[in-house]
């Protein structure tokens, strides 16, 4: 209060009414709550082999996996790492871990050994489920009594086969009492700054997030039991895990799983299985809009195309509409720490609303958002850009073993600060303007500058370094480095030094040699200055 006048707080809610959410249920109980209605309908389909499991089979195997995990000694609250590409077994183990009262941390199988070890150790993983091809990356972890299970037909020496889980006796699963605030998923995110951190998502949080999308008389994201949902985005990413797999399980829709994206294969599967919903990301949109082969396939079954993970330009939106004239197209918006969905396009609702091109939707139900002035911290009215914050039951519990970063992200009033600059127009639609946060988005994947900077300055010929995003037509953004040399070193040597230690999307694309890295008096890198230099090049 200043001068006796109370400041107005501008809060925004969904156009849809709040709903009752069964947030007392564990995640698996919630997702399978209506399984009797869909028991014999297709639930999981492997696009490569046509292997199909119905809902009753998936629910049963989830209980078998829970029993198998218990038999292997995994206790309630302990961690399983899924180091897998998209596959049916991913869903089995994720849901089975929920039944066991365990926690799943997901990791990109293309990570280098050091990246996997760092996450597995930070998360406290006791069991890793993976492919035989990736086992050699886990030698260090196996020497520390981490059990490795492979889903391949012939497990490597020292590993167990997935059948120890999927063929266990489901009646032998010990009963566990799961509290709504217990953690069920532990994806890793770089947050608004710094190194990757474990995001604690609870049963209550994920149940709330799924409900905000697909529950209610007028679901914001209308999935039904006749739908076939394309699952081409990686399940180790929370967007696909939540808005595809979990939402489909809850709604009784079939999930068609592709291990990796290939445009021709994708179009063949859309035609063969009459895919109705296609969640994608901007790089896939780019492939679709630039390829002439789309017209050779019948894609008329597609009724929804939803894009997330990174902003999409109006030109790409328009080009996509030309290729899929019968589909409703729109964007959502989220971040891992928000569970991940903050906003969803109301064009996807059962009773849809008109939406504007370029909008990433309106805030989900049962939540509030506000826009804060990035200088003063005051909440802003419509049509003024500032940092978007969200408060609701779906947001993370916090970062694991990192109270400092948690406090910097979720304030005392429960608001999650996203680090994204956006505005809300008069129709409550959200538009992304910029990012306050430092994270680089390469094809939707997160790249933390601090992680690459730590690698760079570890080189004896590099005195100082800073990493910032540079715009790129296909990837959206790529990491580029500004480097201060302490002795002679070439751009190529620096690129190779980093590439040996990181996954493909973290590779440095350009190196600019400078005399000094601009920093604030407190020593913080002035990334805006470096981005301005790039813009001027």
Swiss-Prot record:
Q: Which Gene3D superfamilies match?
A: 3.30.300.30, N-terminal domain of ligase-like
In what pathway does it function? Phytoalexin biosynthesis; 3,4',5-trihydroxystilbene biosynthesis; 3,4',5-trihydroxystilbene from trans-4-coumarate: step 1/2
Q: Which reaction does it catalyse?
A: (E)-4-coumarate + ATP + CoA = (E)-4-coumaroyl-CoA + AMP + diphosphate; (E)-4-coumarate + ATP + H(+) = (E)-4-coumaroyl-AMP + diphosphate; (E)-4-coumaroyl-AMP + CoA = (E)-4-coumaroyl-CoA + AMP + H(+)
Which leading EC class covers this enzyme? ligase
The family database entries (InterPro entries) matched by this protein are listed as: AMP-bd_C, AMP-bd_C_sf, AMP-binding_CS, AMP-dep_synth/lig_dom, ANL_N_sf
Chain positions recorded as CoA binding sites = 260, 443-444
In which residues is (E)-4-coumaroyl-AMP bound?
A: 239, 243, 309, 331-332, 336, 344, 437, 441
- Residues reported to bind ATP: 189-193, 197, 331-332, 336, 420, 435, 524
Q: Where is this region: SBD1?
A: 262-331
Q: What is its EC number?
A: 6.2.1.12
Cofactor list = Mg(2+)
A GO MF label = ATP binding
Which UniProt key words apply to this protein? ATP-binding, Ligase, Magnesium, Nucleotide-binding, Phenylpropanoid metabolism
Q: Where is this region: SBD2?
A: 332-399
Q: Which family does it belong to?
A: Belongs to the ATP-dependent AMP-binding enzyme family.
Q: What does this protein do?
A: Carboxylate--CoA ligase that may use 4-coumarate as substrate. Follows a two-step reaction mechanism, wherein the carboxylate substrate first undergoes adenylation by ATP, followed by a thioesterification in the presence of CoA to yield the final CoA thioester.
**What does the record say about domains?**
Both substrate-binding domains (SBD1 and SBD2) are involved in the substrate recognition, and are sufficient to confer the substrate specificity.
Quote the protein name from its UniProt record: 4-coumarate--CoA ligase
Ranked from the top, the taxonomy reads: Eukaryota, Viridiplantae, Streptophyta, Embryophyta, Tracheophyta
């Amino acid at each position: 209060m200043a001068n006796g006048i109370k400041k107005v707080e501008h809060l925004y809610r969904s156009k849809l009414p709040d709903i009752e959410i069964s947030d007392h249920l564990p995640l698996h109980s919630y997702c399978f709550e209506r399984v009797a209605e869909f028991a014999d309908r297709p639930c999981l389909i492997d696009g490569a082999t046509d292997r199909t499991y119905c809902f009753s089979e998936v629910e049963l195997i989830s209980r078998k996996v829970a029993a198998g995990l218990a038999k292997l000694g995994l206790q309630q609250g302990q961690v399983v790492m899924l180091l897998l590409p998209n596959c049916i077994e991913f869903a089995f183990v994720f849901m089975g871990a929920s039944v066991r009262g365990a926690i799943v941390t997901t990791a990109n199988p293309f990570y280098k050994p050091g990246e996997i070890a760092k996450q597995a150790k930070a998360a406290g993983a006791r069991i890793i489920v993976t492919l035989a091809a990736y086992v050699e990356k886990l030698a260090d972890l196996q020497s520390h009594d981490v059990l490795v299970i492979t889903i391949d037909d012939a497990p490597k020496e020292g590993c167990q086969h997935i059948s120890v889980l999927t063929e266990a006796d489901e009646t032998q699963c010990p009963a566990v009492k799961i509290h709504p605030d217990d953690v069920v998923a532990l994806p890793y995110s770089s947050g608004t700054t710094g190194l990757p951190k474990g995001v604690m998502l609870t049963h209550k949080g994920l149940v709330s997030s799924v409900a905000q999308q697909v529950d209610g008389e007028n679901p914001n994201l209308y999935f039904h039991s006749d739908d076939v949902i394309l699952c081409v985005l990686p399940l180790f990413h929370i967007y696909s895990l939540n808005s595809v797999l979990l939402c489909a399980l809850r709604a009784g829709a079939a999930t068609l799983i592709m291990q990796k994206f290939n445009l021709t294969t994708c179009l063949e599967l859309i035609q063969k299985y009459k895919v109705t919903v296609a969640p994608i990301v901007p790089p896939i949109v780019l492939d679709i809009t630039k390829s002439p082969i789309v017209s050779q396939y019948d894609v008329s079954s597609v009724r929804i195309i939803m894009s997330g993970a990174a902003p999409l330009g109006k030109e790409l939106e328009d080009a996509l509409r030309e290729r899929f004239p019968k589909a409703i197209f729109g964007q959502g918006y989220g971040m891992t720490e928000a569970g991940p969905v903050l906003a969803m396009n109301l064009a996807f609702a059962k009773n849809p609303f008109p939406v504007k091109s370029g909008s990433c939707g309106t805030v989900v139900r049962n939540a509030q958002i506000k826009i804060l002035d990035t200088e003063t911290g005051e909440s802003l009215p419509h049509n003024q850009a500032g940092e978007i914050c969200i408060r609701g039951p779906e947001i993370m519990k916090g970062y694991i073993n990192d109270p400092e970063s948690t406090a910097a992200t979720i304030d005392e009033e429960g608001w999650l600060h996203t680090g994204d600059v956006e505005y809300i127009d008069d129709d409550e639609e959200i538009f992304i303007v910029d990012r306050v946060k430092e994270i680089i988005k390469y094809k939707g994947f997160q790249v933390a500058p601090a992680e690459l900077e730590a690698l760079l300055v570890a080189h004896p010929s590099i005195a100082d370094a800073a990493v910032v995003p540079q715009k790129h037509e296909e990837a959206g953004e790529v990491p580029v480095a500004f480097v201060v040399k302490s002795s002679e070193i070439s751009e190529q040597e620096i690129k190779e030094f980093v590439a040996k230690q990181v996954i493909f999307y973290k590779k440095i694309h350009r190196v600019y040699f400078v005399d000094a890295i601009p920093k604030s008096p407190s020593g913080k890198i002035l990334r805006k200055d470096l981005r301005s230099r790039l813009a001027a090049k």
